[in-house]
């Protein structure tokens, strides 16, 4: 099962503003919950998300425990050329995931 | 007669005052991990520094009443032409009563085309949510929304 879901239009016209939707499956454990025996459940969250287009950063986010489980982010970008979006999620306990999507600009 | 009435009222106010104090103390003990308004303003100062934060330009879309604080959809948009000269550098979202005042920081650039970000957040209590945008001329603009939460996030026990 893929852990990331990406929604990028396959085609767009030059100069269009497109919406990018991303969802990464992750528990986003806050570090504020306790087990029945009273132990703190250690924090385990995604702390950073980056989106690059043809190598250049177009969007970045710092995430905190107040972001809901399975972080869902949508944002916009202007497309000027065909290319590849690369997505990267980095988090606690060495969490690191990447995904990519291509777009054809006419 | 008038004198006795006065004493009674004073006694009553005294008792009511102590009751209010007693009532307030357990609330503080029950929620030790709550961000205070001081933490919120410290978190905001951390981002904006000494700059003035003005109200306007920013639109914070969040339901006024949510049943489940574990996942609350939120959209922040900023009125900006998003040109190379005039664009939104970043959007920062804060809350009043979660254990931590920060929710997220989002960094955009002129090529975003539209200054709008959506995500889903957690709210531990009914509270205010504040979004602050930093524009390319380093001015800060904000919007605040009140949210009533019936089922709070973070309070349930993990299994």
Q: PLM features: what roles do these ranges have?
A:
Chain A
Residues 1-2:
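Proline/serine/threonine-rich low-complexity linkers at boundaries of modular beta-sandwich domains
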Residues 5-10, 14-63, 68:
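Contiguous segments within soluble domain cores/interaction surfaces
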Residues 17, 80-84:
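Extracellular Ig-like/FN3 beta-sandwich strand-entry sites
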Residues 71-75:
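Short strand-edge motifs at loop-to-beta-strand transitions and within beta-strands
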Residues 83-91:
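Short, aromatic- and glycine-rich surface loops/edge beta-strands on solvent-exposed regions
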Residues 102-106:
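Short beta-strand edge segments in extracellular beta-sheet folds
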């Amino acid at each position: 099962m893929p852990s990331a879901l990406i929604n990028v239009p396959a085609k767009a016209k030059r100069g269009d503003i497109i919406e990018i939707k991303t969802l990464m499956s992750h528990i986003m454990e806050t570090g504020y919950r306790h087990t029945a025996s009273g132990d703190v459940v250690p924090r385990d969250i995604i702390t950073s998300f980056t989106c690059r287009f043809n190598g250049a950063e177009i969007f970045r986010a710092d995430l905190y425990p107040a972001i809901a489980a399975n972080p869902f982010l949508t944002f916009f970008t202007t497309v000027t050329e065909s290319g590849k979006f690369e997505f990267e999620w980095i988090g606690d306990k060495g969490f690191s995931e990447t995904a990519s999507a291509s777009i054809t600009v006419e | 007669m008038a004198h006795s009435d006065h004493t009674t009222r004073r006694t009553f106010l005294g008792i009511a005052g102590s009751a209010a104090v007693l009532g307030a103390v357990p609330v503080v003990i029950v929620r030790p991990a709550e961000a205070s308004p001081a933490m919120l303003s410290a978190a905001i100062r951390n981002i904006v520094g000494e700059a003035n934060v003005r109200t306007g330009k920013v639109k914070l879309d969040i339901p006024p009443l949510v049943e489940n604080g574990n996942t609350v959809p939120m959209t922040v948009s900023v009125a900006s032409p998003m040109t190379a000269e005039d664009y939104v550098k970043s959007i920062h979202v804060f809350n009043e009563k979660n254990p931590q005042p920060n929710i997220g920081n989002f960094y955009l650039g002129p090529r975003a085309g539209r200054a709008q970000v959506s995500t889903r957040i957690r709210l531990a209590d009914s509270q205010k949510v504040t979004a602050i945008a930093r524009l390319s001329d380093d001015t800060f603009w904000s919007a605040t929304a009140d949210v009533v939460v019936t089922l709070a996030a973070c309070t349930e026990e993990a299994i």
